[in-house]
Swiss-Prot record:
The gene is hyfA. This is Hydrogenase-4 component A. Its EC number is 1.-.-.-. Keywords: 4Fe-4S, Electron transport, Iron, Iron-sulfur, Metal-binding, Oxidoreductase, Repeat, Transport. GO terms for molecular function: 4 iron, 4 sulfur cluster binding; metal ion binding; oxidoreductase activity. It comes from Escherichia coli (strain K12).
């Protein structure tokens, strides 16, 4: 099975530490510094949104240039191959892939930037607020998604940075251990006076 990071909304305080850690570690590696996870907020909870590294990943299936592949028990994106078509972001069921525009493009001489006063008058279009439709002349859009910090032997930076342990890396072995522990809790449910295993505190889990 693929590895992935799971988020626990009940423990998340929305401090943005995970986003900062993700951005910093990728910038250090010379990759897009846009965070590989997002923070979704409602009136009651704050939850990190992270790539699930799906077994039958739709993003992998739609990429026209094979920039997305399955390797090392994860779904990985090769930024150097990405053409910025954004199909992967459109089909992701979790909204875990975003578009970043921080890599300059070497434009042909005839397309070099002109001063604003030299441009022909024309109808102005209001800038879009939709992240997938935004663009900037002279900058190439590149998709960014969680790579589980595969360049770090210690694993994802977001998991290690979270002060509340709201993020955890799930592997095949750890999933098996958790399943066995939850089976044990379920079996002892009646013996414990009917206490719901899902109501256990973080320490008890």
């Amino acid at each position: 099975m693929n590895r992935f990071v799971v988020a626990e909304p009940l423990w998340c305080t929305g401090c943005n530490t995970c986003l900062a850690a993700c951005s910093d570690v990728h910038k250090t590696q010379g990759l897009q510094q846009h965070p590989r996870l997002a923070l979704a907020k409602t009136s009651t909870i704050t939850a990190p949104v992270v790539c699930h590294h799906c077994e039958e990943a739709p993003c992998l299936q739609v990429c026209p240039v094979n920039a997305i592949s399955q390797r090392d028990d994860a779904i990985q994106l090769n930024e150097s191959l990405c053409i910025g078509c954004k199909l992967c972001a459109v089909v992701c069921p979790f909204g875990a892939i975003s578009a970043s525009g921080s890599r300059p493009v070497n434009a042909h001489a005839q397309y070099v930037f002109q001063a604003e006063g030299s441009l022909k008058d024309g109808e102005e279009n209001a800038p879009t607020q939709h992240a997938l439709l935004r663009w900037e002349p002279g900058v190439q859009t590149v998709a960014v998604k969680c790579d589980l910090c595969d360049f770090l032997p210690e694993g994802p930076a977001c998991v290690r940075a979270c002060p509340n342990q709201a993020l955890r890396l799930i592997t095949g072995d750890s999933l098996q251990r958790q399943m066995k522990e939850k089976q044990r809790l379920a079996a002892s449910w009646f013996a414990n006076g009917g206490e719901d295993p899902l109501s256990l505190t973080q320490e008890q889990r």
